[in-house]
């Protein structure tokens, strides 16, 4: 039997809603990733959440039972910092709306993170999720954007899943700045290409499967960069939303849980009902569309 995961050299794994919700691990997820026969497959943890650095993310994953080191983690904060470094002179001031970990990524690429400014506007504004973002933070960023500073958003996720439900995500704060500045940001995270491009470099192969819970970020992002994807129904997107999805948000596979990686996928007729197909094949992924990027 060829397991679904055996078709790929790397798994690009979303975190929130795919591996855990807040501080609660999704049942069976660690065991699914550490099943026998995993050897040789690269696991890359790819998160749109820019609030924590790779070490903190890896420590959290390890505490929950996932095999992870900082080198296995790719964040939207890292991708945002790379975009800034490609566009700005070394040492340029960048107004940070987000956590100290986001500021550290900006500093790490040779730019100067700041929180406030007097006089000349900063060269850029970078915006990532922080539970402590306040009105003064957004106002400072709006002043800079009105003065033509470059604007890079780590991601535009409208919601952030946790153990209580869906909380406002960075996209909700981006929407506030969009309204205040009449500007549009450059976006580093999924569904845009920069974050997944960084993840592919880390994986060392394009024979990679994107695994996530959101049609509008994980799955659309995979389609934009020409990768196969598995939608797991453990987080934000539902089966009803999948039935209504546009072509750009159709996954290659859909499954109820991550354990489907350890079983063969099931091909179904194009007009088959996906819910009924999943019920008839418990624990297995159902093929939604043709594969693009598996090992040939």
Q: Where are each of the predicted segments found?
A:
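Asp-based, Mg2+/Mn2+-dependent phosphohydrolase catalytic module
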Residues: 1-13, 20-39, 50-71, 81-296
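Polytopic endomembrane small-metabolite transporters, centered on the Drug/Metabolite Transporter
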Residues: 76-78
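N-terminal helix-turn-helix
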Residues: 43-44
């Amino acid at each position: 039997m060829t397991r679904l995961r055996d078709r790929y050299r790397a798994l690009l794994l979303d975190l929130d809603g795919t591996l855990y919700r807040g501080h609660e691990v999704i049942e069976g997820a660690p065991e699914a990733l550490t099943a026998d026969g995993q050897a040789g497959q690269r696991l890359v943890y790819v998160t749109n959440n820019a609030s924590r650095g790779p070490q903190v993310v890896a420590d959290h994953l390890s505490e929950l039972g996932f095999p992870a080191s900082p080198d296995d983690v790719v964040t939207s904060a890292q991708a945002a910092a790379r975009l800034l470094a490609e566009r700005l002179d070394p040492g340029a001031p960048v107004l940070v709306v987000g956590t100290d970990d986001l500021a550290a990524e900006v500093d790490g690429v040779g730019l100067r993170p700041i929180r406030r400014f007097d006089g000349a506007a900063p060269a850029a504004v970078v915006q990532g999720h922080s539970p402590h973002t306040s009105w003064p933070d957004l106002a400072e960023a709006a002043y800079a954007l009105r003065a033509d500073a470059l604007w890079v958003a780590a991601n535009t996720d409208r919601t952030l899943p946790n153990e209580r439900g869906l909380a406002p995500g960075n996209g909700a704060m981006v929407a506030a700045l969009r309204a205040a500045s009449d500007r549009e940001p450059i976006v580093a995270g999924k569904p845009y290409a920069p974050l997944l491009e960084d993840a592919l470099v880390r994986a060392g192969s394009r024979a990679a499967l994107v695994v996530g819970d959101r049609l509008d970020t994980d799955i659309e992002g995979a389609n934009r960069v020409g990768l196969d994807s598995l939608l797991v129904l453990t987080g934000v997107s539902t089966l009803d939303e999948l039935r209504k999805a546009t072509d750009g948000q159709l996954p290659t596979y859909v499954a109820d849980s991550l354990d489907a990686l350890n079983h063969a996928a099931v091909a179904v007729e194009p007009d088959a009902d996906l819910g009924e197909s999943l019920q008839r094949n418990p624990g297995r992924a159902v093929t939604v569309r043709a594969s693009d990027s598996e090992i040939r």
